[in-house]
């Protein structure tokens, strides 16, 4: 569910191709946004996931907020977000996120969360209240919510996505064959059904897959077919990078030309929009995905 992690290990850094090298985040807008995030004690996936686009996005005054804490109940083998037993969530978080969005004058807001499997509603009420508060404080702001696997709790899913957001995203992360290794607590078929349910609720649907984990081209194309069949509108494809030596190693660095080909194939299969490139992450150019 969580957006793709992006900080390479020491060995990974030595062999990383030039097209994956990015500038350090700097600039007035980045500094201003960092101060606001710290002041309001907010979590961003930009920081927790060590996103390579943080400088570009924060420099433009945009960010992806992570609600329900920064400790996840899942232990996906690719993800840089901390895993463990989360503390109690902050009931004032919806208010603080909404205030930060208003102060930052965000035009398009992306909200995501860790998995909170220990909560009866999977955090659905906090999700709902956060979206509602953002809309109240900033009615002109459009919202994308990148939601977790709800383990077939469809009542909680409905509450989670009924706050007025324009786009609802749920990341597949990888191809079916690699699920047990990459997302051991998730199921490929269940995530597909979640996307189908989101579409049935009338939302614009979005998902992301990371490449370079050992998948084949045929497997990527099958995943595209499965997603189209389950009602997906927008797909993001990006390069997996190993967060630490404790995480899955990179099997392959996918060339930018291959990403470009995947984009054309995805569009030909019926997807409305495909964002595909080595540095693409779920929230990258999210304002274009409405």
Curated annotation (Swiss-Prot):
InterPro entries: Aldolase_TIM (IPR013785), Elp3/MiaA/NifB-like_rSAM (IPR006638), LIAS_N (IPR031691), Lipoyl_synth (IPR003698), rSAM (IPR007197). It comes from the Bacteria. [4Fe-4S] cluster 2 binds at residues 72, 76, 79. One of its GO terms (molecular function) is lipoate synthase activity. Its EC number is 2.8.1.8. The keyword Electron transport does not apply. Pathway: Protein modification; protein lipoylation via endogenous pathway; protein N(6)-(lipoyl)lysine from octanoyl-[acyl-carrier-protein]: step 2/2. Its cofactor is [4Fe-4S] cluster. Keywords: 4Fe-4S, Cytoplasm, Iron, Iron-sulfur, Metal-binding, S-adenosyl-L-methionine, Transferase. Residues 58-272 form the Radical SAM core domain. Its main location: cytoplasm. It catalyses: [[Fe-S] cluster scaffold protein carrying a second [4Fe-4S](2+) cluster] + N(6)-octanoyl-L-lysyl-[protein] + 2 oxidized [2Fe-2S]-[ferredoxin] + 2 S-adenosyl-L-methionine + 4 H(+) = [[Fe-S] cluster scaffold protein] + N(6)-[(R)-dihydrolipoyl]-L-lysyl-[protein] + 4 Fe(3+) + 2 hydrogen sulfide + 2 5'-deoxyadenosine + 2 L-methionine + 2 reduced [2Fe-2S]-[ferredoxin]. It is found in: Cytoplasm. [4Fe-4S] cluster 1 binds at residues 46, 51, 57, 283. The keyword Metal-binding applies. Binds 2 [4Fe-4S] clusters per subunit. One cluster is coordinated with 3 cysteines and an exchangeable S-adenosyl-L-methionine. Signal peptide: none annotated. One of its GO terms (cellular component) is cytoplasm. Belongs to the radical SAM superfamily. Lipoyl synthase family. This is Lipoyl synthase.
